[in-house]
Regions:
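Cofactor-binding active-site loop characterized by glycine-rich and histidine/acidic residues
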Residues: 32-35, 44-166, 185-188, 193-200
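A broad, low-specificity signal marking well-ordered, structured residues that form hydrophobic/aromatic
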Residues: 2, 101, 231
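A general secondary-structure junction signal
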Residues: 76, 235-237, 319
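Short clusters of hydrophobic/aromatic residues that line enzyme substrate/ligand-binding pockets
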Residues: 4, 103, 111, 252, ...
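Glycine-rich ThDP/TPP pyrophosphate-binding loop and its adjacent helix/strand module
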Residues: 119-296, 306
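Glycine/Thr-rich phosphate-binding loops of Rossmann-like dinucleotide-binding domains
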Residues: 37, 82, 241-243
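Conserved acidic/glycine
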Residues: 1-57, 256-349
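A generic structural signal for short coil/turn motifs at secondary-structure boundaries
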Residues: 12-13, 49, 81-82, 114, ...
């Protein structure tokens, strides 16, 4: 497994001081974003939310390894990847508040978040083949969890990329849980990375709580992908929080003996301690980064609140040219409900 923290001094890594500080800055931003999002969701300010605490190093490290024109295919828990890739936090807030038009950002090479499990994997393989036909140089980074490897779309995307040499890095964040199912009940394979052999591609493992290691590994894998050699990366990390705000993880992992050990390896605390020991950052830098992150998020919340709420009837648009009878009936029922109730006065918490 590829690892930097605990095994190499900073000057022995292949990461510049500027990049190391940028990684830390985005890890603080994304941790603060996650904390703020949970608090806002609990107030009923936005819809259900999938927390990613514990996975900041994995996602931020991968995002920073991408070239400017590389395409990101995120899953529903990839908010840190999106933020580090350049998606404004206000856009993610607005998406969670029901604005479908903020599902993706036209100024950043990021596909919309895929909520159905694994559907983005064949999309990335297809986009990679389109890149081969066009002769461009960008690569695709598609992100998914360990649970997605049990889906048929995982097989289809991996097989397609392996056969045709699509420029794709398949980035699996193995956070230990597919909702409530532990990895050992997800697959009989020795590891997720070992699955790559069946598709004729390289499979590698990286310490997903080490942003320097993730950065180095994903950067090198993207270089290979651009040469026609797709790679499967298994980033070993841990989901510290619930699957979503609708989940109660105490029902299935209270007795998990690995929890204390993973919390000792909290990626943000671990990285901050390492950078201080190596003389890369000091207390003043850390405090300034925290203040910047809090100011940015406060402004993002204000910006999101300044946008008018979406029309509830929009949920029926852009799927069918002509609504089928059952949806037509549902739309009429919604319209009748809205004429009798002010949505702003309803308690939807």
């Amino acid at each position: 497994m590829h690892r930097c923290i605990g095994e190499r001094a900073f000057d022995e890594t292949d990461v510049s001081t500027e990049e190391a500080r940028a990684l830390y800055r985005d890890m603080v931003r994304t941790r603060r974003f996650d904390e703020r999002s949970l608090a806002l969701q609990r107030r009923g300010w936005m819809s259900g939310y999938p927390p990613f605490k514990g996975q900041e190093a994995s996602q931020v490290g991968a995002a920073h390894a991408m070239a400017e024109d590389d395409w990101l295919f995120p899953t529903y828990r990839s908010n840190a990847l999106q933020l580090a890739r350049g998606v404004p936090p206000s856009d993610i807030f607005l998406f969670r508040r029901g604005h479908a038009e903020y599902h993706s950002d036209h100024d950043v090479p990021v596909f919309p978040q895929a909520v159905p499990i694994a559907t983005q994997i064949p999309h990335a393989a297809g986009a990679g083949m389109a890149r081969n036909y066009s002769g461009n140089d960008e690569a695709m980074l598609v992100c998914f969890g360990d649970g997605a490897t049990s889906e048929g779309d995982f097989h289809e995307g991996m097989n397609f990329a392996g056969v045709f040499g699509a420029p794709v890095v398949f980035f699996c964040e193995n956070n230990g849980w597919a909702i409530s199912l532990p990895r050992e009940r997800q697959t009989a394979s020795e590891s997720i990375a070992a699955k790559a052999d069946a598709y004729g591609m390289e499979g590698v493992q990286v310490d997903g709580n080490d942003p320097l290691a993730v950065y180095e590994m994903v950067r090198d894998c993207l270089r290979s992908a651009r040469e026609g050699d797709p790679v499967l990366v298994e980033s070993l990390t841990y989901r510290q929080g619930a699957h979503t705000t609708a989940d109660d993880p105490s029902r299935y992992r209270d007795e998990d003996p690995d929890i204390p050990e993973w919390r000792k390896r909290d990626p943000l605390e671990r990285y901050e301690e390492y950078l201080k020991e190596q003389g890369v950052v000091d207390d003043a830098f850390v405090e300034s980064v925290r203040e910047e992150a809090d100011d940015e998020l406060a402004a993002a919340v204000t910006e999101a609140e300044s946008v008018d709420d979406p029309d509830p009837e929009d949920v029926f648009d852009f799927v069918f040219a002509d609504l089928p009878p059952q949806l037509d009936d549902q739309k009429a029922e919604l319209q009748d409900f809205l004429t009798r109730h002010d949505p702003h006065e309803l308690d939807l918490s």
